[in-house]
Amino acid sequence: MPKHGLDRDLVRMANQISRQFTYVSDDEAAVKVAYHLHAFWEPRMVAGLEAHAAERPADFEPIVLAATRILAEQYGEASAAH
Amino acid sequence: MTLIREQDFGTKARPGPATVHVQVDGRNVDVPEGTSIMRAAATAGIDIPKLCATDSLDAFGSCRLCVVEVDGRRGTPASCTTPCSDGMSVKTQTEKVQRLRSGVMELYFSDHPQDCLSGGGHGCELHDLADTVGLTEVRYGQPETSHQDAAKDVSNPYFAFDAAKCIVCSRCVRACDEVQGTFALTIAGRGFDSRVSAGQDQPFLDSECVSCGACVQACPTDALQEKTLIQLGPPNRSVLTTCAYCGVGCSFKAEMQGDTVVNMVPYKNGGANEGHSCVKGRFAWGYASHKDRITKPMVRDTIEDPWREVSWDEAIAYTATRFQQIAAQYGASAIGGITSSRCTNEEVYLVQKMVRAAFGTNNVDTCARVCHSPTGYGLKTTFGTSAGTQDFASVAKADVIVVIGANPTDGHPVFASRMKRRLRQGAKLIVIDPRRIDLVRSPHIEASHHLQLLPGTNVAVINAMAHVVVTEGLMDQAFVDERCEDVAEWAAFIARPENSPEAMEPITSVPAAELRAAARLYATAPNAAIYYGLGVTEHSQGSTMVMGMANLAMATGNIGREGVGVSPLRGQNNVQGSCDMGSFPHELSGYRHVSDPTVRELFADLWGAPIHPEPGLRIPNMLSSAIDGTFRGIYIQGEDLAQSDPNTQHVTAALMAMDLVVVQDLFLNETAKYAHVFLPGTSFLEKDGTFTNAERRINRVRPVMKPVTGKQEWEVVVEISAAMGYHMAYANESEIMDEIAALTPTFAGVSFKKLDELGSIQWPCNDAAPNGTRTMHVDGFVRGKGHFVETAYVPTDERTNRKFPLLLTTGRILSQYNVGAQTRRTKNNTWHPEDVLDIHPSDAEMRGIHDGDWVSLASRVGETTLKAKLSERMPPGVVYTTFHHPVTGANVVTTEFSDWATNCPEYKVTAVQVTPAPTTRPLIMHQVPLESTLVEVGAASAISASGVSASGAGASGAHASAVRTEAADPRA
């Protein structure tokens, strides 16, 4: 479908971001991805990503899943404050 | 009321350390060595008569009017071609000289329309000089042969050439050569038969002339004259302002009769353009008074209703009330705004302030999202500041110039003229572009290397170039050791075999040997400069590529002085400014993240409103959220998303899903079809404020007339905010800039007063740089050390396949501008009345397509129809089109893929198929799951906007998606 909601964007965008950090270890990449999402993604996008990852983790690269865990652990308070 | 007339010194300045002392008519004057007598005299306040000389051109010495006598020298040398020597004494008004001048003028007038002798056109130097030399009669009588019956050439829509008035001084020819660099004119014939010839003795319109107007400006008679000047007569006042087209930001004198613009003359002291311009800025300003201009606010409850003109009070109250209702029901995060890169800094600043303080959200973005947002990300990450490093004049010191993903002769023509001048002087050129742009080979210019890469492989190429630099020992080790960090990690990464030119060749299609040669040329040049455009940024790795270029520049020490650098050719007149003003969901003005509590406190204190600490939605996220139902109201200032943003069907579906779409613009555009409120905006001729160009140069925009809408745009924003309960108070635009300066360290020293004093200011302008900053990162990077980033090449997800085997890339053309809202409403349609599809002859032949045939251009998201133009400028497998005409709808086929860091759309890489179209009239069809409906543009159609909204919103699966494509009056 040419038109689409945010959810489809989130999967595509998150996976795309994760593929940019192949030059570091997966752990480091997850940290970088988490930072990027926290710095540039609006809270409903982060929340949508976390919800989708919890429900359908197979849609995401492993680095994205690791990044969502870091997001919740390190930035969770800030996200919840929105 | 006065006309601004810049002094013409007759010949160019010759800056240099040595000085000579001369005396002209008894006045002592010191000038740099090499200065002409003419210029020295002008410096001393003495104007020597001249016709063939002007200080934008090299001296020519043909008219013989400027002859003088020099003590101790024989004869009467031309003062324009004679340099001063130390101790020289010059006489400019001896009896002998006056006699010679009078004789020369008499000869000129012997073959010149007699009416010029007693009256003349505006600024006719020949007429003025006749008075100066005291010429009152021509004794030659009517010669047997003359040029008085010479035909006029009125082919150009903007200026006329009357050969009868031409004195063959060659100023026009030299202006076309030296200033513009097109070489479209010559002097044909010899002796009495000499005549100005365009092209191969063709009408101007049929020749290579690009209608920049440099010849018109250079002409000392009325031979070349603007048609508006002929029609309206001479102006009587000038207003200095700035062009509203591209990111060059040319300064102009708007020359007026009352409130009527007669002509726009490039301002010689304009920092960006120094007296030059292009066809758009100089001539295509008529859109400001076009009949399509909307001057009254309009509202409607639904987009199916006709528009209703209302008062400003009603429109503002309606807008404010609706935003408040939506926010109350769905939360402040359900509303937001988009600012324009065509509006002033002051206007943009206030819209983002309204969104943050009155709406209570960071859901504000700007059109830089779809063009140079990767520049902001990439240069901030590597250098520490989201802007280019140089000014335009810097190119004059470059020894090697790299142009990547840009076509400056079309997109930034005045800067291109500077670049071409440097190339003609011997600088080398490397072009990295899938298309053979004009710069690859044009008069007196040929690229040393054209790396004709496949679309989507920029990072592979730049990494391969950097690989050469590192592995062949071409790094400027002293520079990187002193000024940069993370060098070793980056060098180890880039040296890997997979980054070599040989490994990348199958991916990029660039021969390894060619790439190695180009890399060596760049790395070994004393000064090497990179200029780039949207062919870099509008990719899935746009930000990565910007960082890759920054890596290359740092690795070779090409940062921090003139002649080097990394310079984005920013598209719009104020896209730099709209970014500077914090019109981003994650940043406040000066590129400071909203999460920084110190910055938020600064704004909150001055604004009296809290700033949200989390980033807001970007434009693509706003649209997707609208389809989800979580984003429901939008304020769109001067942007036409429905034409300019990718995947048109997605955009229009999102707009239709919203409860409130407010459009502030000059004309009803594609986006306005989906709007509930239309607030008429002001053109640049009515605005009072500033634009910031690609050089970080803040220029004044001064009004030549009152707003035809009755209000300045910023006043409307202030009133909407007030109606929503947030009050702002400014007496004028200068006070808005004062607030910007108070809050933004890079603007701290900027004020309207200082801009009037200095003419323009390049930020940063603060205590450390009170007059602004020409070149960035001179002694150190803004972030401290330059940061090397490992830029792994990741192929785009957009792939060709059997169904879509070609790659589409898009771009601009000289005569039209962006979505064409302005230029389509001028005579520039003469040159580009429609978008066409450039296709390689071999691709066309395989498909049975001939030049001029209608073709269907289809991608996985949509299809459109346009005419084919066979061209070898692209390699086989790549097609190209522009996006200036809504009827073509080029963005119907572009996809949702975007830059990983910024969501800048990947306009430059779309997998498509091209097939002969079964019809002879243009069609736009959106791809649908089960059935398709063709809608003929211009034909009566039973499908209305209501049909679109009913079928387009909500339902998934089978539905007919028929889109009204004709820009019919929605008020009908």
State what each model feature region is.
Chain A
Residues 1-27:
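N-terminal acidic leader/helix
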Residues 55, 60-82:
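C-terminal structural segments of small proteins and small subunits
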